């Protein structure tokens, strides 16, 4: 197919609010939500796309829908450093949402090229790299092979900080779509009405965040001096729950108790080792959350927690989220 155009120079339909924002990875699972949140916030919003998209009609239609809502489409590529520099020169804030999930694609280190482009451009006031999960700085003892996710994110962090680029890191813990839909069971995204496997005793607390809320909080943070060069945590108090508590909410909705099987730590690890590499990476993350409680073994100050920083943002509770599956 032909190009969508290097830049849509038409005036966005929404009034500009604050910084000009470039979203990279804007057609992805979280990226499309970041674009929507940016537009909804009134930001002059730019969405980067590859010069040629082939015949990926869904991606093209999504990009065109962004354009119709007032976004600028910017043609650039990680294989063309000059195009990256030109793209970031258009904006004040860069938000990157390229995939770091191995079952999709793991592209975290591509951001090193983006860091170089931002450094060369010299105009970016805030960079939000692709993180949005567990804080990698707290995972230095993570298990193989899943630790590669955290290690690579730390490589990018060091490059950002060594380059002197202003940043905000967003730790949004567990995506609700992946965790709540399957009642915290790996490999499931719809809740059963009959049976659930509890990981260990099912009592380790996780933190479950609606992806739209992650996007909304991120867009609030980009112009906030309180979040400059800091990590913010999306840890809404009503969403800090154990697997048993999540299951209990679901049981209340469907009016019955699920049959429960306990999966011991040893059996989980044995099963994990039988999977392919990409699956093992994801299962390692489940292990740290559900067996070790890595999301609830530390306290977060109010000035670093998103729902405290922005109390006017209504976040979706676990109860509200699960209701859609009834």
Swiss-Prot record:
Gene Ontology MF term list: lariciresinol reductase activity; pinoresinol reductase activity
Binding site for NADP(+): 25-31, 50, 59, 157
Keyword Oxidoreductase: yes
EC number: 1.23.1.2, 1.23.1.1
InterPro entries attached to this UniProt entry: NAD(P)-bd_dom_sf, NmrA-like, NmrA-type/Isoflavone_red_sf, PCBER-like
Alphabetized Gene3D superfamilies for the sequence: NAD(P)-binding Rossmann-like Domain (3.40.50.720), UDP-galactose 4-epimerase, domain 1 (3.90.25.10)
Pfam families: NmrA
Phenotype upon changing residue 286 to L: No effect on enantiospecificity. No effect on enantiospecificity
The UniProt record lists the keyword NADP: yes
Active-site residues (renumbered): 153
Keywords, alphabetical: NADP, Oxidoreductase
Effect of residue 143 to L: No effect on enantiospecificity
Residues that bind substrate: 285
One of the protein's GO biological processes: lignan biosynthetic process
Induction of expression: Up-regulated by continuous blue light and fungal elicitor treatment. Not regulated by salicylic acid.
Domain of life: Eukaryota
Catalysed reactions listed for this entry: (+)-lariciresinol + NADP(+) = (+)-pinoresinol + NADPH + H(+); (-)-secoisolariciresinol + NADP(+) = (+)-lariciresinol + NADPH + H(+)
Subunit structure: Dimer.
Function: Reductase involved in lignan biosynthesis. Catalyzes the enantioselective conversion of (+)-pinoresinol into (+)-lariciresinol and of (+)-lariciresinol into (-)-secoisolariciresinol. Abstracts the 4R-hydride from the NADPH cofactor during catalysis.
Homology family: Belongs to the NmrA-type oxidoreductase family. Isoflavone reductase subfamily.
Protein name in the entry: Bifunctional pinoresinol-lariciresinol reductase
Native organism: Linum album (Flax)
Origin organism lineage: Eukaryota, Viridiplantae, Streptophyta, Embryophyta, Tracheophyta
Gene encoding the protein: PLR1
